[in-house]
Structure formats: C-alpha cells, structure tokens
C-alpha cells in the first residue's frame, strides 16, 4: 500500500557500491540483505533532492489483489506482492523513502532485495515476471478503494534483458502527475524489486540505477 497508493493514502547501511565489482556475484545469505540497500544519503544524492525520509524496513510481502486482481499488472504496479512471489522466496528487506514525508510526496523510492533458494529459482521468477509485464505495457489502470478513486497510472514500453526488466509509467491524481520507473532484476539468487518516482516531466532512471548499485555491492 505504501508505494503507489501513498499519493492519496497513507536507515540501513550499505557497502561501498560506487564502482562496479568484477566477476559474477556470489549467492547472497540472509545476513547480507540489509547492507545491500542504499543509505538515505545515497538516495538523496541519486534522486537529486534532500530530505528523503526512510520508513522502517519491511520483511513480509504485501497483498493488493483487492485493488488490482490482474496478476499481469499487479507485480508491475507494486513491489513485493505475495500473489506474485508466492512461497518461493526465503527472505526479503524493503525500505521505502519519500520526500516530503507525507501522502502528497514529490519523490519516492522503494528499494527491496529478495533471496530465493537458488540462482535458478531467482532466474525463473524473472522469466515469469517478464511474461506478465509484457502483457501490461502501454496499459491504463484505474483503481477504486471504498468508492474513492486512487491515482490513475499508465505504463510505457517494456525494456527487457536476460537479467533485468525496466518499465516506465506515469501516475496522475487530479492535476498532480508523477513520472516513475519500475525495475526488476536478478543476480545470483537475489531479486531486486525497485520503484522510483519524481515530479511529472522528470526523466526517471533511478530504479535502474539502484539495481546497478546493489549489484555492485554484492560479494564476488
């Protein structure tokens, strides 16, 4: 609920991940999850703003099927959905940062890392998500909660590689527009599920940039 719904409804440490590490990443143990996430200072710099506030870490999946039962779009619309991940994952950390820290925010970043039992299962999750996201491109979604319309959103074109999905979208609430980017990526047994939003008209690449930072911080 926190991420895409927050316009109308209601710190971690990080390894030195400025430069790309060499060689393939090792599988990630549960004990390493939190240090992979970016600090508030790093997020402020990346989002070219100040005053981003980090919310407490989340360790469980969400369920918003009551708002969007279409599973092709649910995982593209929201990070860390239980109906999308099922019971295949073994551990996760999610931290939401927004500025100003209120429902009517201007900048939002949701960063999450999810461990799967094996590299193969993590890659399989990305493949399944690619099939779903490809059926939710250039798509309008209008959602109502208790008779109250939530922000409308429209997705753009999907960019896909063998290890990453990138999907831009815009969200509108009255005359307020946000430009957003979703990124879903895999490295070893780790899935990175990221969302970044900035004021309308912005060029948003930060979700993909967070993926690069997290990958660079993984042990080799």
Where would I find each of the regions flagged by the language model?
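N-terminal "mature-domain start" segment
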Residues: 15-96
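Sec-dependent N-terminal signal peptides
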Residues: 1-5
